[in-house]
Each structure stands twice: as structure tokens, then as C-alpha cells.
Amino acid sequence: MNINATIFGQTIAFFLFVFFCMKYIWPNLISLVEKRRENIAQALNEAKQAKLNLKISKEKAKKRIESAQIKCKNIINEANETKKLLIEEAKKEAIKIKEHIISQGRLDILDEKKRMCEDLKTKISEIIVMSVEKIIESSINKKISDNIIERSISKINKIKG
């Protein structure tokens, strides 16, 4: 066997093999590699987009939390203001009730004072009448007795009037 013919045959077989591979196998491998490259590029883009979406979502969540905190503070402030108003109204109402009770008590005291004065005048007049009667009964001089009676009656009239 001739080495040149063998090498030449192997070279032809190699070129046929390379041609066959380039014609039928290589395009499939290249298309698989391209599809894989596209899938990887698409996955990387999706990952970048997901990162961006996550960042945006975090910012939105932060803004919502801040908004909720502001709303909570506003609600608390409104509740405090309402509480203050209710307390003020309750104080005013309590003061009105207190003043009403005090004025009613004063009126009751004045009424009681008037009633007691009337009772006292009545009792004094009764005592005076009784003492005058006793004086008259024990008195000998009618003129003196009449004078005493007239003074007593005038004093009683002054007390009543």
C-alpha cells in the first residue's frame, strides 16, 4: 500500500466528512447555539426587567407606606382635635350645669330665708300679742295699757310691712 494514496484517501474522506458535517450537522448546531444564545439573552433581559420592576415596586411600596403614615398621623391629629373639642364642650356644659345648680341653690336659700323671716315675724307678733295680753291683764291703769298696746301694734306693723 502506498502511503500517499492512503493519505490522499484519508484526506478525501476527511473533506467528505467535513463537507457532510458542514452541510447537515453544522447548521443544526449553529441554530441550537443561536437559540440558546437568544434564550440566555432573553433571560438576562427578563432578569434586568424583573430587577427594574422590583425597584419600582419597592419605591411604590415605600411611597404607599409614607402615604399611609401621613394618613395615620392626620387621623390621629383629627382624633386629638375632636377629643379636645369634646372635652371643651363637656367643660362648658359642666360649668353651665354647675352655675344652674348654684343659682337654683341660691334661689332655694332665698326662698327659705323669706319663709323663715315670715315665720319669725309671725312668732314675734304672737309673742308680742301674748305679752300685751298679760300686761293688760295685770295692769291697773288702762291709759298706760292702751299706750303700750298701740306701740306694740305699730311695731308689729313695721315688722310686717
UniProtKB/Swiss-Prot annotation:
It is a single-pass membrane protein. The chain crosses the membrane at residues 12-32. One of its GO terms (molecular function) is proton-transporting ATP synthase activity, rotational mechanism. CDD domains: ATP-synt_Fo_b (cd06503). It comes from the Bacteria. InterPro entries: ATP_synth_B-like_membr_sf, ATP_synth_b/b'su_bac/chlpt, ATP_synth_F0_bsu_bac, ATP_synthase_B_chain. The keyword Lyase does not apply. Keywords: ATP synthesis, Cell membrane, CF(0), Hydrogen ion transport, Ion transport, Membrane, Transmembrane, Transmembrane helix, Transport. Its main location: membrane. Pfam families: ATP-synt_B. It is found in: Cell membrane. GO terms for cellular component: plasma membrane; proton-transporting ATP synthase complex. HAMAP family: ATP_synth_b_bprime (MF_01398). F(1)F(0) ATP synthase produces ATP from ADP in the presence of a proton or sodium gradient. F-type ATPases consist of two structural domains, F(1) containing the extramembraneous catalytic core and F(0) containing the membrane proton channel, linked together by a central stalk and a peripheral stalk. During catalysis, ATP synthesis in the catalytic domain of F(1) is coupled via a rotary mechanism of the central stalk subunits to proton translocation. Component of the F(0) channel, it forms part of the peripheral stalk, linking F(1) to F(0). Belongs to the ATPase B chain family. F-type ATPases have 2 components, F(1) - the catalytic core - and F(0) - the membrane proton channel. F(1) has five subunits: alpha(3), beta(3), gamma(1), delta(1), epsilon(1). F(0) has three main subunits: a(1), b(2) and c(10-14). The alpha and beta chains form an alternating ring which encloses part of the gamma chain. F(1) is attached to F(0) by a central stalk formed by the gamma and epsilon chains, while a peripheral stalk is formed by the delta and b chains. This is ATP synthase subunit b. It comes from Wigglesworthia glossinidia brevipalpis. The gene is atpF.
